[in-house]
Amino acid sequence: MSVLDAAEIMDLIPNRYPILFMDKVDELNPGESIVCTKNVTINEEFFQGHFPGNPVMPGVLIIESLAQAASILILKTEKYQGKTAYLGAIDSAKFRKVVRPGDVLKLHVTMEKQRDNMGKVKCEAKVEDKVACSAELTFIVPDPKKKI
């Protein structure tokens, strides 16, 4: 059973197909941690060119998946509700395992620091409990009345 389904996810973040990279939220502790699921299918548009005959999910899209999970965690925190979270920086990104069609990508995000309109999260994307990607992401949640 999911905590948030696809429709509820789309109520929180602005991403839509083909750039929405999560199917459901499995666990959510606002302000602390989140676990989400992305079912990776052969129907993903990026597999047409990455790579024909050897489909592999691009690492940058795994990072984007983690950033979307982080956005949900951030935006479910009371002070950020109704706003948009933006990716500000990627640190210590490591790719350890390829992600292929048929894999279930589990996105684990933990809040590390938070202050004013920014913060840092620690992330891991796992397939069958093996780390495919890890990174630290910095986020910014600007005042919606100000242009960034």
UniProtKB/Swiss-Prot annotation:
Instruction: Name where it's found.
Output: Cytoplasm
Coiled-coil ranges per UniProt:
none
**Which molecular function terms from Gene Ontology are attached?**
(3R)-hydroxyacyl-[acyl-carrier-protein] dehydratase activity
Residue pairs linked by disulfide bridges in the UniProt entry: none
Q: What is its EC number?
A: 4.2.1.59
Against Pfam families, the record matches this protein to:
FabA (PF07977)
Against InterPro entries, the record matches this protein to: FabA_FabZ, FabZ, HotDog_dom_sf
Q: Which UniProt keywords apply?
A: Cytoplasm, Lipid A biosynthesis, Lipid biosynthesis, Lipid metabolism, Lyase
- Active site annotation, chain numbering: 50
Main localization (coarse): cytoplasm
A GO cellular component entry from the record? cytoplasm
TM spans (from-to): none
Catalytic activity annotated for this protein? Answer: a (3R)-hydroxyacyl-[ACP] = a (2E)-enoyl-[ACP] + H2O
Q: Please tell me which top-level EC class this enzyme sits in.
A: lyase
- SUPFAM superfamilies membership: Thioesterase/thiol ester dehydrase-isomerase
Q: Name one GO biological process term.
A: lipid A biosynthetic process
Q: What the protein does? A: Involved in unsaturated fatty acids biosynthesis. Catalyzes the dehydration of short chain beta-hydroxyacyl-ACPs and long chain saturated and unsaturated beta-hydroxyacyl-ACPs.
The UniProt entry's sequence similarity note says: Belongs to the thioester dehydratase family. FabZ subfamily.
Protein name per Swiss-Prot or TrEMBL = 3-hydroxyacyl-[acyl-carrier-protein] dehydratase FabZ
